[in-house]
Amino acid sequence: MSTSTTDTDKYDRQLRLWGEDGQSKLERSHILLLNGSATGTETLKNLVLPGIGSFTVVDNKKVTESDLGNNFFVERSSLGKPRATVVCELLRELNDRVKGFSVEECPIHLINNNISFFKDFSLVVANRLSEEALLTLSQYLTEQNIPLLITNSYGYIGYLRISTPEHQIIESKPDDPIDDLRIYNPFKQLVDMADALELDKLNTQQHSHVPYVLLLIKFLKEWRSTHNDKMPETRAEKDEFKKFFNSHSWSADEMNFVEGIQNLLKYIQPPRVPGDVQNLLKDPKTNITENSDDFWVLVAALKEFMTNNDNTLPLHGNVPDMTSETHNFIQLQKGYQEKALADLSEFSGYVDQILTKVGKSSISSDLVKKFCKNTRFLNIIRYRTISEEYNQPKTNLIKSELEQADTVMVFYILLRGIDKFYKTYHKYPGSSDDFESDIPLLKTVITQYLAEINISNDLVKDDYIAEFVRFGGSELHNIASLMGGVTSQEIIKLITHQYTPLNNTFIFNGINSTAGSYNL
């Protein structure tokens, strides 16, 4: 994507997070929201501002007094008007580059009578839908490979569930990755640069500015020559090497030697392929056919690259800041970049071979390059379907969590009970004037549900049930706003394929500000 000057100015801060490629994916996305509730509109707000391409709101309800109390995207003058139209108009005002559409129709009616309506969206956000509707919708979206996010706020409780068949992550962007400097097994350019060092011929300024990477490579090679070609492994050996390394320093304040000692333990470990990447390489989907998607073609090419490179991943090529004179750093940086380009060229060759073999069209060079630079951070998440969650519940996990003090898992049980209550009584518990009469009814529903999943009902206290009835099906704006932020953040991860989204359920307790995530 070639971002215009205006785009760069408008989206400057987020471009630093997910870059132009991520922004391009956002700007091509079309998000569907089912029900324009407070939680739903807060979610869209946080997607319209960073510049999704377009959104559609499907909602058959009219704006009511309760909407005025919790939804910032309706006004008093909107009372009685179609909620889909009202929230769409106000959301569009946030960003004139984003297109917004409204459909005044019942989401459940669309699901039951026109399911193909959903096939052209990038992602679907569902809010306050029945279990039956969610099962039907999620099954269809799974077949279409379209992510579904179910987000709700109920009183002080927030809930988010992600469902998508397979989410591929190329840029997981871990918080504190270790730079790939190849000190343990340096490539030829690094060895040549280290061997060329004549430290005794340098002046004090030059000696104190030799990059620590080259110092470590040089002195590790010397140390190994007197230790049967072994790297320092035991604690005693590492301490011995530190003394040997420091013995070549001309003064205690040479920062390059200080940096070498500080980074020693990180870089004298044998290179390890991350577990997530190992799992990808073993996946049956690396057996490529003409129907394989690009991600798995690239994984198969990576497998071939590693087979021919002593199980080593392609070099990223980035060099961190370090004490060095400018010309030395540029020379070092050039060595890493040349090796990274050579690895990319070899990797691209394997990609082309695989594509030719199975008769697939080419993969964009930008994607190949991005994949090759991020091979240490690859991952996939295969989500359980909503049907699996409902029909094959993880009883042991749920029971174990319920036995913990102050667990948020209890709210998962209560929310499932609320859905079942609504199915039976066509209302939310506590939404009528005589709310106390709903307490025993909700307790009965929850007791029946717990019996279905073989969990004792004494793990859900009556106080929680009464509190949920007092919520009366209400949405509170502060909880809706928080859940809108959480949901939109996960949507951006899913659309950009950057960072790692949660798997698969998030529950927030606004009463005491605790939260939990579970793979249900």
Swiss-Prot record:
Nae1 and uba3 correspond to the N-terminal and the C-terminal part of yeast uba3. In yeast the two subunits form a single polypeptide chain. Keywords: Ubl conjugation pathway. Residues 321-334 are annotated as: Interaction with uba3. GO terms for cellular component: cytoplasm. The record marks 209 as: Interaction with uba3. GO terms for molecular function: NEDD8 activating enzyme activity. This is NEDD8-activating enzyme E1 regulatory subunit. Pfam families: ThiF. Pathway: Protein modification; protein neddylation. GO terms for biological process: asexual reproduction; chemotaxis to cAMP; chemotaxis to folate; protein neddylation; sorocarp development.
